[in-house]
């Protein structure tokens, strides 16, 4: 494995830590190769050996084990023209209880002309009284393809924890060739039991997920995806899923009343979409570790 040296930092509990990742790949001699890599504690990047038949992989690691109030993380991924890559996170991101300050995560995904990027973060677990503000900005070039998503779990259901107070502000902004084509915002703040339990809102769900596919195949895959979801029995009392197309983007929403089944179904759908896009119809090994 290859990784860049990390930069030292001094932790200040009142201010949190500031970590960042800057990662770009370029096409050289018909292969996607690392162009530049910068990271600072508590973040680092590992470039593992590429599995057969797969695009080059990058793994983002948060060595602190989770986010506390005041932490700020900044991730920027750049896929230069015609590159093929997959970037994922090593493990679930935990957002711990805060005494008042917000944890902030800024993500920028640049997918230049003819490139294909998969951004596969593992689930975010929001602890009771955790506070998270996350923004994902996407910049698509001509004929760019992106498969990306996020999954959020509301509390540690395996420990019987209920999410009662806190903040979740999770937004997406997608630009295609300079024009904003999709904006999305989920905001829960203060007393979280009302929106989490209300039948017209999250109806007691333990987690939710969003998947986004951009590319010329996106709209054409809507009906095949719906058919696959039905045949695979993805919907049931523990999981609800819906898919649609917005300005040429395929958007899939999930609600789960069982966190394990939500993650399992989400991964199966991701694998199916990979197969439709010419990649192996499987999840990276790290997903199941």
Swiss-Prot record:
Keywords: Chaperone, Cytoplasm, Nickel insertion. The keyword Electron transport does not apply. Its main location: cytoplasm. It is found in: Cytoplasm. GO terms for cellular component: cytoplasm. The keyword Cytoplasm applies. Coiled coil: none annotated. One of its GO terms (molecular function) is nickel cation binding. UreD, UreF and UreG form a complex that acts as a GTP-hydrolysis-dependent molecular chaperone, activating the urease apoprotein by helping to assemble the nickel containing metallocenter of UreC. The UreE protein probably delivers the nickel. Belongs to the UreD family. Required for maturation of urease via the functional incorporation of the urease nickel metallocenter. This is Urease accessory protein UreD.
């Amino acid at each position: 494995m290859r990784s860049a040296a990390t930069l030292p930092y001094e932790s200040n509990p009142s201010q949190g830590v500031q970590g960042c990742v800057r990662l770009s790949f370029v096409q050289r001699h018909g292969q996607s190769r690392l162009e530049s890599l910068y990271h600072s504690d508590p973040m680092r990047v590992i470039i593992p050996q590429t599995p057969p038949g797969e695009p080059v992989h990058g793994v983002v690691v948060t060595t602190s084990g989770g986010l506390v109030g005041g932490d700020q993380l900044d991730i920027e991924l750049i896929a230069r023209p015609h590159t093929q890559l997959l970037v994922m996170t090593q493990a679930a991101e935990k957002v711990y209880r805060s005494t008042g300050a917000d944890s902030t995560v800024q993500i920028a995904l640049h997918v230049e002309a003819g490139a294909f990027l998969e951004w596969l973060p593992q689930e975010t677990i929001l602890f009771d009284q955790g506070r998270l503000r996350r923004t994902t900005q996407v910049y698509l070039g001509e004929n760019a393809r992106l498969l990306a998503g996020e999954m959020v779990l509301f509390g540690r259901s395996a420990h019987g924890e209920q999410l009662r107070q806190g903040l979740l502000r999770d937004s997406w902004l997608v630009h295609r060739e300079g024009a904003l084509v999709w904006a999305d915002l989920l905001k829960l703040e203060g007393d979280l039991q009302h929106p989490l339990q209300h039948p017209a809102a999250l109806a007691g769900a333990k987690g939710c997920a969003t998947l986004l596919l951009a590319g010329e195949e996106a709209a054409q895959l809507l009906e095949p995806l719906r058919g696959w979801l039905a045949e695979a029995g993805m919907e049931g009392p523990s999981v609800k899923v819906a898919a649609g197309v917005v300005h040429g983007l395929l958007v899939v929403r999930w609600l789960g009343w069982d966190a394990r089944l939500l993650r399992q179904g989400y991964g199966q759908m991701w694998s199916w979409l990979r197969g439709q896009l010419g990649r192996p119809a499987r999840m990276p090994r790290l997903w199941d570790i």
